[in-house]
Amino acid sequence: LEALLKAKLLEKGYDVQNIDMTVGTSYTAVGEALSAGSADIGFISGGNYVLFSDDCDVLLTALRYGINKDSENAADWNDGTLEENTQDMTTYYRSIILAGPSAKGQALLAKVNSGEELTWDDLNSATWSVLAPTSASGYIYPSLWLQEHYGKTIADLDHVVQSDSHSTSLARLATGQADVMVSFGHIRIKNAPNWQEKFGGTAPMVEQTGIIGVTDGIYNDMIAYSKTSDLMACLL
């Protein structure tokens, strides 16, 4: 890899003599190396960028196909149709708070669709399905959304179940074990066909679920540089 990168850089007019490439044990480990200045450049996720943005910044961001709904107003997503992929490329995606078919989930959804603001008590009385604290769409950004709107985080919620995957969260949502779940904004595009047969829904997903919260954009995976690296300080 070092030789390949040197050759590509030379094609661009950069004659770099020494490149040392290592593989981090996780995105977090790479973020920590960038923060400490022991790595000059690293590949990290958007979630880790949030955690280490004081000590690193973005050089390049991956692109992905966008979806046709991007409003930060949750009610705008609830038009009776599922989200669709588009041909437009974007540098980010969003996390959504998805209400399910339980009585509590539907009550929260009805309030959002009527134009009312959800209160902290509304959200705190619901059972949430979340992912591990390192997940951007399944924990970090929904927690930031709660912080921005209510001065609270997921850790402050009274009823939280941690799932091992988005699929597990979907199953809990469909069967009423959870009232709401957090996930990436295009979760329904992929999983709507399996909502009833695989996850246990009793009607089409578009009829049984709806969005009650939308986070800020989450950067796609990126190449970031260290602000604490002596080498990068000389180059930038």
Predicted regions and their residues:
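Extracytoplasmic
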Residues: 16, 36, 44, 92-94, ...
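Short beta-strand->loop
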Residues: 57-90, 103, 159, 193-217
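Short helices/loops that flank or line small-molecule/ion binding pockets
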Residues: 20-42, 50-55, 165-190, 194-195
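Solvent-exposed coil/turn segments that connect beta secondary-structure elements
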Residues: 44-48, 63-65, 100-103, 133, ...
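Pocket-lining segment of extracytoplasmic ligand-binding domains
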Residues: 112-119, 124-234
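Short, polar/charged alpha-helical segment
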Residues: 1-17, 144
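Short, well-ordered beta-strand elements
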Residues: 1, 18-23, 125-130
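A conserved helix-loop-strand patch within extracytoplasmic ligand-binding domains
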Residues: 63-136
